[in-house]
């Protein structure tokens, strides 16, 4: 049996609703799935309800938080087994949502200066189309990218990011981020475990430097590291597994599925280059239960 501990829905920048994502996981034969939308837990209750209805599909409530890290790399931190009703999580989500809301109009304004005629109203409409029923609308760059496609400014979402919205794009603006320690503490305060997501995106070709970064994050309270990911080749996977053992981090893995926004990434399979065995989940769950027990003793 296989699992997927890194996926996204329409609650952030995925294209499947939380309900449809659970159905896709069931159809793919997965035994467990985590929903880890960017900076929000809005889709978790819907996903949990559908997973329970389907049966034989363990649901892990999660989140993915962007943390401050020097360019050109990026640091994302996954939270697993978080409490969707946590006040700490809600405060953090509100803070990051406000940061997104401040950035999005600047991006649209810059795009108009570059000749791409789209409006925030169009972007908001696209975000509403894709949001789960009753959930707060979280607007992100994928919604702006979709507006660019609909306005015939670009042919594809990928082209929108390459030309305008990615970190080297002409309309890119950085957003406010938590420090790594703040992100880890927020996840812990929400009852979850913190994991380094896709470590290759830290963008360091120096294994010694990568080890130093991972060590610092472990010392800051990190619980795990994503060993299996669609961006990891065999060499990277082996290196991350080695680092997990060296710094006593629980190895995790997932496809980073986004639906049609990443059409080459398949749920549970990545780019057909990964299978995360179900045996990965029990150690993560055991540490979560141990932490909960410690908190209540």
Regions found by a protein language model. Give the residues of each.
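An N-terminally biased module of ancient metal coordination in phosphate/nucleic-acid-related enzymes
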Residues: 1-72, 165-166, 184-185, 190-262
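Extended substrate/RNA-proximal surfaces in nucleic-acid metabolism proteins
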Residues: 52-212, 216, 275-297
